[in-house]
Amino acid sequence: MGRNFQSETRIAGFITKRDVILGGLRTGAIFGSLFGSFLSLLTGVGVLFIPFVGPIVAAGPISALLLGAASGAIAGSAGAGLVSVLTTLGMPEEKAAIYQTRLQAGEFLLLTEVPSDRAGEFQLLLESAGAEELSTIDKTLARPCPGPCKSPEDLSPEVRSHLSSEAQSTFIERYNGVLNETTDEFTAEQAAWEAVHQKFDEDENGVWSKAKVGV
C-alpha cells in the first residue's frame, strides 16, 4: 500500500472475514486467498497483491483489491476503512491505527505471508531493510483446494460462494491443468482466477456469474 492512499470514507455497514479477501484475485492482481476470500471491501480504491514468498501486499492507490463490497461492508476508500480491514485480518486495533496514520502521512505498508518457522528470519530481514512497526499475525491462510479440485465441493466455501456453477467449472479446469503442469498451488490459483476473469464479470452481489460477450 503506497503513499497518499487516503480520502474520505463513509461507513455503510460491517466487515466480516467473508468480506475481507477475494476481490483483487479476480483481476489476477492478487495471488492467494487470505482467509479464503479477500473480497472487495472499499469502493474505488485497491491494493496490489504480488507473489514473493507467498502473497505480499505491496501497492499504491490501485483499484484491484478493495473494489466495492459485495455486501456493502464499507464504501469509500482506504482512509478510515483501513483499520477495519487490518483488524478483520487479526491485527490489534491499536497497531492497525498506527499503520493507517503512517500510510496517510505518505509512508508505505507491506503485508507478506511467510512460513511460520521462518517468521523471525523474515522479520530480521525487514528490520535490516529499515522496516518499522512490524506486527505478526499467526494465521493459516486458506487455499481454494486441498490439492487437486475433483468437484466444486472441494473448493473452499469462500471461493465457491463467489463463483457461479459455470465459473466454478472454469476455475477448477484451469486450476487442475496448471497444478498438473507445475505442482505449484500458488501458480495454479493465479491462473484459475485469471481464467475466471477472462470469461466472467461480477454481478451486483459480487458473484462471478455474468458471461462476457464474445467469450
UniProtKB/Swiss-Prot annotation:
Pfam families: ChaB (PF06150)
Top-rank lineage group of the source organism: Bacteria
Entry coiled-coil feature ranges: none
SUPFAM superfamilies found in the cross-reference section: ChaB-like
Protein name: Uncharacterized low temperature-induced protein all0457
Species in which this protein is naturally found: Nostoc sp. (strain PCC 7120 / SAG 25.82 / UTEX 2576)
